[in-house]
Amino acid sequence: MNTLSSARSVAIYVGPVRSSRSASVLAHEQAKSSITEEHKTYDEIPRPNKFKFMRAFMPGGEFQNASITEYTSAMRKRYGDIYVMPGMFGRKDWVTTFNTKDIEMVFRNEGIWPRRDGLDSIVYFREHVRPDVYGEVQGLVASQNEAWGKLRSAINPIFMQPRGLRMYYEPLSNINNEFIERIKEIRDPKTLEVPEDFTDEISRLVFESLGLVAFDRQMGLIRKNRDNSDALTLFQTSRDIFRLTFKLDIQPSMWKIISTPTYRKMKRTLNDSLNVAQKMLKENQDALEKRRQAGEKINSNSMLERLMEIDPKVAVIMSLDILFAGVDATATLLSAVLLCLSKHPDKQAKLREELLSIMPTKDSLLNEENMKDMPYLRAVIKETLRYYPNGLGTMRTCQNDVILSGYRVPKGTTVLLGSNVLMKEATYYPRPDEFLPERWLRDPETGKKMQVSPFTFLPFGFGPRMCIGKRVVDLEMETTVAKLIRNFHVEFNRDASRPFKTMFVMEPAITFPFKFTDIEQ
């Protein structure tokens, strides 16, 4: 039975919804009352000529091979902190803003069901190509309005409560132990450097960890079963989708008018991943039924089993979305953490000192209790997110008319909130070009934390629509970094002046043959 329409599915999350409803109504009234004729119109917002902008992405154009960071930075220099990105080929315009007051205004007026457009190719596939699978359940990535609210309410307790992660501490540690052995196998015995394609190994580690949560199984792609065809299909498609989304939904594309080769590849990719996911979850269901028939008491603690209790269709969709949203972004973040620590050996030594107090031996187990005492580890990861921002920011569609930077922006307008760019500006972060995990810790003399605008540090989004996988990513990152730095001293002896580029999300622009030297004690 599909319980999404049941009382249970809509009753979860009542508290936050009520409070956000009253807050959103108040914000809407304030925003509406503040709009006057003195404000400039939407048409007066600076913007490039649509056809010149389109030509800039064509062969020989200014932005032909540019990352999203490069061309938005160029636009910001020309037009200022707010401008319109022209829509074309069936895609509407969107506003880009780098003003913290604008960012706050949009979030304060997003309502109880925030709308995030921008993944049209995935939405089209789910609504028109495979409605037999998705139907009314589009997943958190693609759904909007009340449908999104019901789904989010139903699955929020599964992902957002810390107790839901307890069962994963030990298996995640085991996966990382396997990764450590893999590093020892592939590193050069003389230089101790890993191969140039080490980012593929990192992606396999992240895929293995997320696959454990999404599919209740280890795929074996790190060492044991590297050629598993089903696992490889999921692995490759999860990495391809973001790149294809960037080409279809961010760069100018005619896929809404004609079926382009890139869109056809996207359709094949989404179909392939869906077929494998359905096959794997059917195997899980069959195994679960056998256990029931054998009289075994089933304790549904895993995230997947709890999702299947809601609706098997929800389980399929969420399992895929975990991989699509998580593999590339988390793998790049892990590469960035290792790079930051290798280029700042004093910070690496300080982190290892903290880890030694929690993990006296290399094979010490990590658990819910001892991982509470790792403030410097969390500060390192948080500072890496600031130092190498993952993307430009968050997209929202205005739920009502708002004033942004003095301009009247009508309801229904999509706005790109460029908060991540602000994390590298001295206005908000002193010494922004320095890697300083200490900025996130309490001052040892005053006991106070750094004061920073909450609308400049939003790596996982904000409000009801913030990333539902945040706790999963936090656990994976903390476990992996702790295990690696406890076991190895990490170095990087190459140029790292421009190590990453931002397409849809941040991705490596260079190879990462890190040097891993064993820690003796």
Curated annotation (Swiss-Prot):
Q: Which cofactor does it need?
A: heme
Which GO cellular component does the record give, naming just one? mitochondrial membrane
Instruction: Give the transit peptide range.
Output: 1-19
Pfam families given in the database record: p450 (PF00067)
Per UniProt, heme binds at C467
Ordered alphabetically, the record's keywords are: Heme, Iron, Membrane, Metal-binding, Mitochondrion, Monooxygenase, Oxidoreductase, Transit peptide
Which Enzyme Commission numbers does its entry carry? Answer: 1.14.-.-
Q: Which cellular compartments is it found in?
A: Mitochondrion membrane
A GO BP entry is:
response to insecticide
Mitochondrion is among the record's keywords: yes
Q: Which family, according to UniProt?
A: Belongs to the cytochrome P450 family.
Q: Which PANTHER family match?
A: CYTOCHROME P450 (PTHR24279:SF120)
Spell out the protein name for this chain. Probable cytochrome P450 12d1 proximal, mitochondrial
The species this protein was found in: Drosophila melanogaster (Fruit fly)
| Phylogenetic classification of the source organism | Eukaryota, Metazoa, Ecdysozoa, Arthropoda, Hexapoda
